[in-house]
Curated annotation (Swiss-Prot):
Gene for this chain: SMIM14
Species annotation: Homo sapiens
Predominant subcellular localization, coarse grouping: endoplasmic reticulum
Disordered: annotated span: 78-99
Protein name stated in the entry: Small integral membrane protein 14
UniProt topological domain (Lumenal) ranges: 1-49
Keywords annotated in UniProt: Endoplasmic reticulum, Membrane, Transmembrane, Transmembrane helix
Amino acid sequence: MAEGGFDPCECVCSHEHAMRRLINLLRQSQSYCTDTECLQELPGPSGDNGISVTMILVAWMVIALILFLLRPPNLRGSSLPGKPTSPHNGQDPPAPPVD
């Protein structure tokens, strides 16, 4: 204990505060018990209705598929039979004039 009867540790961690934390910990970890059985979780609807990693991955795959199907024609690999594949119809471009 420090001089004058003042204990700085008492301000941070008092006996009452430690007992409250212990009681809260015990209350939270207790099982729900009846006369015939003890359950770890309370009966009723489950609270696990959050978004899972699988749902996020499926959503990204759907977005990727939609973007793939809606891409512009110039990014598609196939060309129409009557259209040339390049501006020079498969031939080398003409040489630049020599000065």
